């Protein structure tokens, strides 16, 4: 009997992953809110349920008789990893914990973790409203700042501004999937913006602005212990089998970590 694999998100971007998994003799159970999802034809079974419908995903698992010997996978939006982790936990499937996924999605959580575990970050405040923003800006002598919502994914609610010309009317203060509770206010850190992909015992560095792979910063990255620090985070979250992306800013003698991608 073929092992089952719950595949979350069956849009066009996910089709190459579906095709690859289909060649490995899995019984693919697809899940997508769109009943006419483009990848539906590659699934052995299909359920019209969104990756953020946690109860609905569990119902699918029960109906399809998932067990700990089966799998769950998603190549959809990062938010889909929450659904995958919740599903895996319910059926005792090997997968990073829901707590670890929540940590990687919520800036307030991972900046707090970084701060407590010696991972360098810019000067940071959690902001709930415009009054708190005004108060924190007065505490800093920095010229430039970034204001980012707790679940922001660029360009959603990411603002860069000069402290002498704050765009007060331009900030969104409602609440939605990208801003759930806090904004994160950070002093701008000067340096080169890089993305580091860490996987297994390897890593690759990319220029954040151009997306081009680069090796010119390896010496500084190694000497500052950046990779060891990032691998320690990955290990503690039990994500050693994943490719994890980190956005950092690097200068001659220091660095800060800004973001995590799964």
Indicate residue ranges for each PLM-predicted region.
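Phosphate-binding site of ATP-dependent enzymes
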Residues: 166-256, 262
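ATP-binding N-terminal substructure of ATP-dependent carboxylate-amine bond-forming enzymes
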Residues: 1-99
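Hydrophobic anchor at the start of a short beta-strand
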Residues: 28-29, 121-122, 183
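Short amphipathic alpha-helical segments and helix-helix/interface helices
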Residues: 15-19, 85, 111, 134-137, ...
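A conserved helix-loop-beta module that forms one wall/lid of the active-site cleft
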Residues: 89-166
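Active-site flanking residues adjacent to catalytic metal/cofactor-binding acidic residues
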Residues: 8, 31, 147, 186, ...
């Amino acid at each position: 009997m073929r092992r089952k694999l719950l595949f979350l998100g069956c849009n066009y971007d996910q089709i190459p992953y579906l095709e690859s998994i289909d060649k490995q003799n899995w019984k693919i159970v697809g899940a997508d809110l769109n009943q006419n999802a483009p990848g539906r034809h590659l699934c052995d079974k299909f359920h019209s349920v969104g990756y953020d419908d946690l109860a609905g995903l569990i119902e699918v698992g029960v109906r399809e008789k998932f067990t700990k010997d089966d799998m769950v996978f998603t190549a959809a939006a990062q938010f889909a990893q929450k659904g995958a982790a919740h599903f895996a936990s319910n059926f005792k499937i090997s997968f990073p914990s829901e707590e670890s996924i929540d940590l990687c999605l919520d800036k307030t959580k991972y900046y707090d973790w970084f701060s407590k575990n010696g991972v360098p970050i810019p000067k940071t405040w959690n902001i709930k409203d415009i009054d708190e923003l005004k108060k924190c800006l007065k505490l800093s002598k920095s010229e430039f700042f970034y204001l980012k919502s707790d679940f922001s994914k660029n360009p959603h609610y990411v603002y860069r501004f000069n402290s002498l010309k704050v765009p007060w009317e331009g900030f969104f203060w409602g609440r939605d999937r990208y801003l759930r509770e806090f904004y994160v206010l950070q002093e701008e850190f000067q340096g080169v913006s890089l993305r580091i992909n860490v996987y297994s015992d390897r890593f690759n560095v990319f220029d954040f602005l151009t997306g081009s792979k680069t090796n010119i910063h390896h010496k500084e990255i190694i000497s500052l212990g950046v990779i060891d620090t990032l691998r320690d985070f990955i290990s503690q979250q039990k994500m050693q089998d994943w490719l994890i992306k980190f956005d950092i800013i690097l200068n001659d003698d220091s660095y800060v970590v800004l973001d995590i991608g799964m």
